[in-house]
């Protein structure tokens, strides 16, 4: 947690310094609220070798941003996911679980703080098309359950990773000082912590799942 606060403070300082540089420009701040759907990439449980699939989860974020020019803006966003899960039932092939029918579930908790930059690629009368990228710290932990194998269920501690985000979207003005946007984003939040447990006298590594997601988000921006 201390590491996340340190990185957050550094991010805020960088954003503040950049805004001070642009103080002489006639630009505006904005608030951004977004929500949408997300799906994680398919991954494999290392303990059993069962390949896991993602459910459809909800992503939300809240941010404050600044227009540096007509075609460039940046914002600082705090985001998380709600109800995300990687799960699958199958037959384990790894020792000591070989031949065991098991249902595996990974439920992550992810909180990320990102500095994002966006550039308008086109400017039409009705809408704009933009591309963007973001980077910042992410706290990642997971709850792991194994139905069919006793003694493996576990919850890992938070791990601080560097999260990366790539975005392509479109925006339109619907009222004075109000814009809506629809965007696709790919986000890499890194790996959760792994841990060793003893099962029938053997050490078994569980956890350590990598979380990469595809996101479709609808947002609204209020100029302030």
UniProtKB/Swiss-Prot annotation:
Matches recorded under InterPro entries: OMP/PagP_b-brl, OmpA-like_TM_dom
Name of protein: Putative adhesin A1E_05320
Keyword entries, A-Z: Signal
Signal peptide as annotated in the record: 1-22
Domain of life: Bacteria
Pfam family, one: OmpA_membrane
Keyword flag Signal: yes
Source organism: Rickettsia canadensis (strain McKiel)
